[in-house]
Amino acid sequence: MAGVLCIGIVTAQPRLRQPEFYLGVHGGATAGTVLFMPSESGMSPITKACVLGGNGGFVFRYAGHKYCHFQMELTYEHRGWRQDGVAHNLHYIELPILMHLNFGGEVCRWFFNLGPQIGYCVKDESSTITHPFDWGLTAGTGLLFKTRKAGVYHIEIRYDFSLGGVFGTTVTDKHSMANPMDLSVNLGWVMPVPQKRKLKVESL
């Protein structure tokens, strides 16, 4: 259903005379936790206290349509949870692959990002997790601001929910669910990549 919706949105957009490419960076502050579901029947989900951290990385954006773009990121993200006063800090390298929709005027636009992501825990400070590979969904919304010569700036609120788990979740394990999730506030900047055939930037 989601795939059909995405195809419908893209095909309904006016195409650009020449595809546009953007490169940039982004980063911000995160608040991460883990949603645990005990394996015992009748037990309620347990959300641990948050760990505060940060994220940062690179942004690549392809614009073939005026308001609907394809965006890929390579990001470092600090995740984890706090339990009994002890912080369990996890450091991930993540690859979100997003549909980027934006609406509005020539200078300021509202945007929405949605798509899957995969990641890998490159450092576990507590040496507690058993499943370093991660995958899940990412959704974010915010405002972007276009300048004449200094690129495009944006501010975004983003939510990430892991569909994998940091621990085993089989019937013999302690938890039936151990899913990381985090909320972040990010600032970013992208610049159009120069092309041989110079046309007016139409996507922003």
What is each PLM-predicted segment?
Residues 25-31, 72-76, 112-120, 143, ...:
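Transmembrane beta-barrel strands of outer-membrane/channel proteins
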Residues 179-204:
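Outer-membrane beta-barrel "beta-signal"
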Residues 12-57, 188-190, 204:
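Short glycine/proline- and aromatic-enriched beta-strand/turn motifs that initiate or cap beta-hairpins
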Residues 19-21, 58-125, 149, 191:
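Gram-negative (and chloroplast) outer-membrane scaffold detector with strong preference
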Residues 1-8:
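Bacterial N-terminal signal peptides
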Residues 35-42, 82-88, 124-129, 166-172, ...:
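Outer-membrane beta-barrel translocator domains and adjoining extracellular loop/strand segments
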Residues 19-21, 48-54, 89-95, 131-137, ...:
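Residues that define the transmembrane beta-barrel architecture of outer-membrane proteins
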Residues 13-15, 44-48, 60, 85-87, ...:
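Outer-membrane beta-barrel proteins
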